Curated annotation (Swiss-Prot):
It comes from Psychrobacter arcticus (strain DSM 17307 / VKM B-2377 / 273-4). NCBIfam families: NuoI (TIGR01971), PRK05888.1-1 (NF004536). Belongs to the complex I 23 kDa subunit family. This is NADH-quinone oxidoreductase subunit I. Transmembrane segments: none annotated.
Length: 182
């Protein structure tokens, strides 16, 4: 008789506890969100879609050095180098296959000109796989991106067309080493 009462009390406690849990979850805020209507919060350093940025002057920053394609662990970046009349290199074509990209950010780290930048945009779903191959026209943006004042050619000291050494902006005239000899 004692075991029957014990089993009945344990059974009632289990039922009351289960009902309490169900009712407490009914009034709690929902864990799931309605995705298209409610935007997903992304962290500040989120690595999303890749873009190609421009210099503050408006020229494209990419010098087709191919470091991004070499750094990519899955080989989803391909480009071909060409040269302008002033001697500056540029990519004739720049192609990223986002169906293979793992968004690791190694291409952004390898880029010496900060042309490749990762954005927080992650909505790139397509019905056709070939639409995930982005060309240079799709990747280029009109602004400088994350680094608005950075210009690769000014930082590296590359010769500016139609200006001798030392005549460019923020550049000192070269020193004559023979004048320093005793």
């Amino acid at each position: 008789m004692f075991t029957t009462i014990k089993k009945t009390v344990i059974g009632l406690f289990t039922i009351v506890r289960s009902m309490w849990m169900v009712n407490s979850h009914a009034i709690r805020p929902r864990d799931t969100i309605l995705y298209p209507e409610v935007p997903v919060p992304v962290p500040p350093r989120f690595r999303g879609r890749i873009i190609l940025s421009r210099d503050p002057d408006g020229d494209e920053r990419c010098v087709a050095c191919n470091l991004c394609a070499v750094a990519c662990p899955v080989g989803c970046i391909s480009l071909q180098k060409a040269e302008r009349e002033d001697g500056r290199w540029y990519p004739e074509f720049f192609r990223i296959n986002f169906s293979r990209c793992i968004f690791c950010g190694l291409c952004e780290e390898a880029c010496p000109t900060t042309a490749i930048q990762m954005t927080p945009d992650f909505e790139m779903s397509e019905y056709v796989r070939q639409d995930l191959v982005y060309e240079k026209e799709h990747l280029l943006i009109s602004g400088p991106g994350k680094y608005p004042d950075y210009n690769y050619y000014r930082v590296t000291g590359m010769a500016v067309a139609d200006k001798p050494k030392g005549a460019a902006q923020n550049e000192a005239a070269p020193i004559d080493l023979r004048s320093l000899l005793p």
